């Protein structure tokens, strides 16, 4: 590995002085292997140029380009350490992540019947999946040379994840890939979304590229007006640009980290998992076994996986005022997914005042901020948007098993425009497992759009316990603004839950214990119903302490899940609650200021300022 201390020593020698502030010059530090920041860098501040032009990158230039006619340019693939052309699944052209040749060019197709699964001992993964293709897709696949199909990849959306598999064979309208055995809850089915990438016969649109691995070259169709091509691929196998290990009190300022590889494989990627975000094995920058490692005013862009991971036994530190965009997966991961009782976990990490946008470009199930097994962390005042899956996720244990994920704070974040109607079962803020002392507050969440189901705003999933969710504003979600799968003793208080498409509130498992307390909330809708249909009766049967909530249907009709509000309130004992117009200034235009005469105030609702959510005002 390249050691950061060598770069630091060179910078200090050039400055002719002894100091703990290492000023890195403008320009690129181009890596071919991971840079290690160890204990010999403790106490140092690595400060890039004030304009952010100091960049640590794994970029490898592609070119020169040859005009092949027909709107196609070609360039040789760079050679790897073994002297052979590298294989790449990512290409950046003129600062833009270019689109791989794709079938279809936009959108998706679906199998015509449920996918057939058979045991296949000869395959590396043990199972073979066979898809029946729609005729228009089969025609394109049949047109591709058989020798190239091995370099084409099927992307198959399975609820909350995306499987990625090279094509094994094609015949008579059926395409086969090798993968892991399907879980009972994530079968590949007729209506699921699919596409095929890196298929020569789909290389037909401006801005697309095709990796001809057999010929050792890249083909590209320029966009209109794109005369000069400045193109890069990530260095082969370089998933992590910088690894910090056993260091303390290290700060990185004004540095850009760019262009890491999505996976270490030398050929077409095979990826499948049974849980969202579980695939993620790396990040552009990883911190392990270190204390107070801080990233301030840094930029993470064009990554292959997550941007930043505070991984194992990290104490303190975090990301402050950073920007992360064009991400292969998500923004920041904190902690590990595995944990044994008694083990130290990552703690005290902050993600504060950051912009995390446009993620999931290679791994669509990437999360904006993912807290696994970690405690006492804070995710505050961030803007998180443009993802295909969840905004902030907290916890990694199912049911009521003991968990080290405690006392985390998710507050004052603006989380919006996620899901993009491609994955399912997501939340603006998602929690999983016991999480005593965790607080989710003062967030603004909107634009959560799922494919088949589960575009939730606030989502307490399996075994969530001991969590307080208060002072949040949620609107424009596909499913409930608040949904609890099952959990115990959570508190949902003083939230504004507005106009979800299919229902406003859901509790989908009734248990013997108290599931939650729901008090002083304002719930208003113009479409759907008060409760999501498949959770409606369970929401009534679950042990919930309902108190002093305000419910309002925009047309004023006192219809409440097929009955009257008075009847419903009497059955569930929603004590002190009312059906009344909350008197917002203009809720349809997202002005949620309350009139002084609002009946919500008489119920004890405490107004909060949604404009405080998101990055702090500059």
Model-derived regions, located:
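Bacterial N-terminal signal peptides that target proteins for export
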Residues: 1-6
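Bacterial Sec-dependent signal peptides at the C-terminal "C-region" and cleavage site
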Residues: 7-19
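Extracellular polysaccharide-degrading/modifying enzymes targeting complex plant/algal/animal polysaccharides
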Residues: 21-301, 340-341, 573-580, 588-618
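Predominantly extracellular beta-rich ligand-binding scaffolds that present long acidic/polar faces
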Residues: 32-40, 45, 466-589
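Short glycine/acidic-rich loop motifs that flank beta-strands on beta-rich extracellular proteins
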Residues: 33-34, 239, 261-267, 282, ...
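Extracellular, surface-exposed repeat architectures
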Residues: 46-47, 52, 56, 364, ...
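Right-handed parallel beta-helix
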Residues: 248-259, 291-302, 314-329, 343-360, ...
């Amino acid at each position: 590995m390249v050691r950061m201390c060598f770069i630091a020593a060179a910078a200090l020698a050039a400055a002719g002085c002894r100091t703990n502030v290492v000023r890195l010059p403008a320009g690129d530090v181009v890596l071919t292997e991971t840079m290690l920041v160890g204990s010999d860098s403790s106490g140092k501040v690595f400060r890039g140029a004030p304009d952010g032009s100091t960049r640590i990158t794994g970029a490898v230039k592609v070119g020169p380009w040859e005009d092949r006619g027909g709107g196609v340019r070609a360039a040789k693939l760079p050679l790897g350490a073994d002297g052979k052309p590298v294989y790449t699944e990512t290409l950046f052209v003129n600062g833009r992540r270019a689109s791989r040749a794709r079938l279809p060019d936009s959108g998706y197709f679906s199998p015509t019947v449920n996918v057939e699964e058979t045991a296949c001992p000869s395959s590396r993964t043990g199972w073979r999946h066979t898809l029946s293709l729609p005729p228009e897709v089969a025609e394109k696949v049949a047109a591709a040379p058989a020798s190239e199909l091995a370099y084409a990849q099927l992307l198959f959306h399975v609820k909350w994840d995306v499987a990625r598999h090279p094509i094994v064979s094609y015949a008579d309208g059926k395409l086969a890939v090798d993968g892991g055995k399907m879980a009972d809850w994530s079968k590949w089915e007729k209506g699921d979304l699919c596409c095929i990438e890196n298929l020569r016969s789909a290389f037909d649109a401006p801005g697309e590229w095709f990796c001809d691995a057999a010929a050792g070259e890249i083909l590209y169709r320029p966009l209109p007006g794109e005369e000069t091509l400045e193109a890069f691929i990530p260095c082969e196998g370089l998933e992590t640009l910088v690894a910090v290990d056993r260091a303390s009190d290290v700060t990185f300022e004004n540095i850009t980290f760019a262009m890491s590889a999505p996976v270490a494989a030398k050929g077409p990627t095979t990826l499948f998992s049974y849980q969202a975000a579980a695939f993620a094995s790396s990040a552009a920058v990883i911190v392990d076994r270190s204390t107070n490692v801080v990233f301030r005013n840094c930029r993470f862009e064009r990554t292959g996986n997550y941007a930043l991971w505070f991984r194992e036994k990290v104490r303190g530190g975090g990301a402050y005022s950073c920007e992360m965009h064009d991400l292969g997966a998500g923004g920041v991961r904190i902690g590990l997914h595995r944990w044994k009782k008694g083990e130290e976990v990552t703690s005290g990490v902050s993600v504060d005042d950051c912009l995390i946008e446009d993620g999931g470009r290679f791994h669509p199930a990437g999360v904006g901020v993912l807290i696994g097994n970690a405690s006492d962390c804070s995710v505050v005042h961030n803007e998180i948007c443009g993802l295909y899956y969840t905004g902030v996720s907290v916890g990694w244990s199912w049911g009521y098993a003991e968990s080290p994920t405690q006392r985390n704070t998710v507050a004052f974040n603006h989380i919006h425009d996620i899901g993009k109607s491609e994955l399912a079962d997501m939340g603006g803020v998602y929690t999983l497992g016991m999480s005593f002392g965790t607080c989710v507050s003062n967030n603004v969440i909107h634009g959560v759009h799922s494919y088949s189901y589960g575009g939730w705003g606030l989502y307490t999933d399996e075994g969530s316990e001991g969590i307080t969710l208060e002072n949040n504003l949620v609107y424009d979600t596909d499913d409930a603004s608040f949904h609890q799968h099952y959990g115990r003793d959570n508190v949902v208080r003083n939230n504004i839950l507005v106009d979800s498409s299919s229902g406003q509130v859901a509790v989908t498992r009734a248990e013997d214990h108290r599931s939650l307390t729901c008090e002083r909330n304002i719930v208003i809708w113009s479409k759907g119903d008060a409760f999501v249909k498949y959770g409606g009766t369970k929401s009534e049967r679950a042990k919930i302490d309902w108190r002093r909530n305000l419910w309002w249907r925009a047309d004023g009709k006192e219809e409440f899940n097929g009955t009257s509000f008075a009847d419903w309130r009497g059955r569930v004992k929603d004590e002190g609650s009312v059906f009344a117009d909350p008197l917002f200034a203009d809720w349809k235009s997202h002005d949620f200021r309350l009139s002084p005469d609002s009946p919500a105030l008489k119920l004890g609702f405490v107004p909060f300022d949604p404009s405080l959510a998101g990055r702090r005002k500059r």
